[in-house]
């Protein structure tokens, strides 16, 4: 079964503060004022990659390599990214290629590479969180041996050993500049540089079709998926998960009070908003996007995921949600990633459209109802409808509704105890897949998704 959810919430009232936060700072003459200005001087193809092959082997019908490539030179020192690369052995055609971006505290994943190789892709999993030395976790790639070269950021450190760097524009000994405030001092800028160089690695491999590149990532990797898709038109399909939503710098007003921003920005908040916040990247995305998440995720907040992706112009956008969870995905949601990539990169069938939904407020019994019309491109197995009166997405309790089915249409009553509360509703439609799909290459997965 494959889960897709509605393209937007049905909302009676959702209270969100939209006030611009400023700090009255004087900007230097070279301070960029937009995403385009921030990235105008970066060419991901300019420098040679200086690829090192640390190890290579054959396994399960694939060719695999532990590699390292040059990200760039910062403060006179080279920065190099370790990664795992693989592709199907004896491929007789140019292959689509996908970059996997790991989450916080994680590492380049051989399992993720194997999953994609088994489906006919070349795949690269970058090890942005690795460190070549010093104190703190090393985070070597999956399967690394003692003494293997690792990611080495040289004169900067955007890894999680420099946590404050994710929410700062200020200078520092580990940042891009040591003498002035600038968006390039932010860790996300440097990590996006590294990931875009990963795309360059992929497009230069002889077995890869450079016109068919995709990217997917989880958590902090979901953030980086949005950054890469918003800055690099080589990306033809993107799948962020539990990350990549905008307005993290902004306080949010709920019925119970005001929640502090997810990120407390050190430096000019308005410059951060215009150059590094995801609502400024979404309008620049020029590829189809599937967003996977959990309804109560702390990192990819549900309401703001919808707000952010609504800014993506003229591209197919889908959502797949695991209800009641925080920062984890059910198998029915996980499988949506390779199916999305298959359609846009590898000739697979199109996924069903987002179900149409209507919130009906006028009824004979005075009870609101949600009506859902599913796309029957794939057989519709069932529909789940949920509602809530909790305005804070992180603490929102989703109540299951009794669903009445009429063909591929579904209706559920959403009774309220009071009329002075917000009402939120969404639906998950489960489709039977064209064929069973395996996730067995990933840890903890056995039975195929059907």
Regions found by a protein language model. Name each.
Residues 82, 93-103, 123:
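Short beta-strand element of the alpha/beta-hydrolase
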């Amino acid at each position: 079964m494959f889960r897709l959810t509605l393209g937007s919430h049905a909302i009676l009232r959702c209270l969100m503060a939209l006030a611009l936060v400023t700090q009255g700072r004087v900007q230097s003459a070279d301070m960029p004022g937009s995403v385009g200005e921030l990235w105008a001087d970066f060419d991901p193809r300019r420098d040679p990659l200086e690829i090192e092959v640390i190890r290579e082997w054959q396994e399960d019908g694939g060719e695999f390599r532990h590699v390292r490539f040059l990200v760039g030179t910062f403060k006179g020192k080279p920065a190099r990214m370790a990664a795992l690369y693989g592709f199907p052995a004896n491929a007789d055609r140019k292959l689509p290629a996908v970059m996997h971006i790991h989450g916080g505290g994680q590492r380049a994943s051989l399992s993720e590479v194997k999953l994609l190789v088994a489906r006919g892709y070349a795949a690269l999993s970058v090890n942005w969180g690795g460190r070549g030395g010093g104190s703190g976790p090393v985070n070597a790639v999956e399967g690394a041996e003692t003494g293997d070269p690792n990611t080495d950021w040289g004169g900067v450190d955007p890894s999680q050993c420099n946590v404050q760097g994710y929410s700062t524009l200020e200078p520092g000994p580990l940042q891009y500049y040591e003498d002035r405030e600038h968006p390039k001092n932010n860790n996300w800028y440097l990590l996006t540089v590294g990931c875009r160089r990963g795309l360059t690695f992929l497009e230069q491999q002889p077995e890869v079709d450079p016109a068919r590149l995709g990217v997917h990532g989880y958590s902090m990797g979901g953030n980086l998926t949005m950054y890469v898709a918003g800055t690099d038109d080589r990306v033809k399909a993107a799948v962020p998960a539990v990350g990549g939503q905008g307005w993290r710098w902004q306080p949010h007003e709920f019925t119970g009070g005001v929640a502090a921003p997810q990120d407390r920005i050190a430096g000019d908040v308005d410059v951060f908003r215009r150059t590094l916040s995801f609502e400024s990247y979404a309008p620049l995305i020029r590829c189809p996007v599937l967003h996977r998440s959990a309804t109560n995720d702390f990192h990819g907040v549900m309401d703001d995921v919808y707000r952010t992706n609504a800014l993506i112009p003229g591209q197919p956008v889908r959502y797949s949600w695991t209800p009641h969870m925080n920062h984890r995905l059910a198998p029915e949601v996980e499988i949506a990633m390779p199916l999305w990539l298959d359609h846009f990169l590898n000739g697979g069938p199109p996924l069903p459209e987002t179900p149409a939904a209507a919130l009906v407020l006028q009824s004979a019994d005075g009870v609101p109802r949600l009506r859902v019309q599913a796309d029957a491109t794939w057989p519709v197995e069932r529909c789940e409808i949920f509602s809530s009166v909790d305005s804070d997405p992180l603490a929102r309790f989703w109540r299951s509704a009794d669903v009445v089915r009429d063909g591929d249409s579904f209706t559920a009553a959403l009774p309220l105890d009071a009329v002075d509360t917000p009402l939120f509703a969404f639906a998950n439609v489960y489709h039977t897949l064209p064929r069973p799909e395996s996730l067995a290459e990933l840890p903890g997965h056995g039975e195929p998704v059907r």
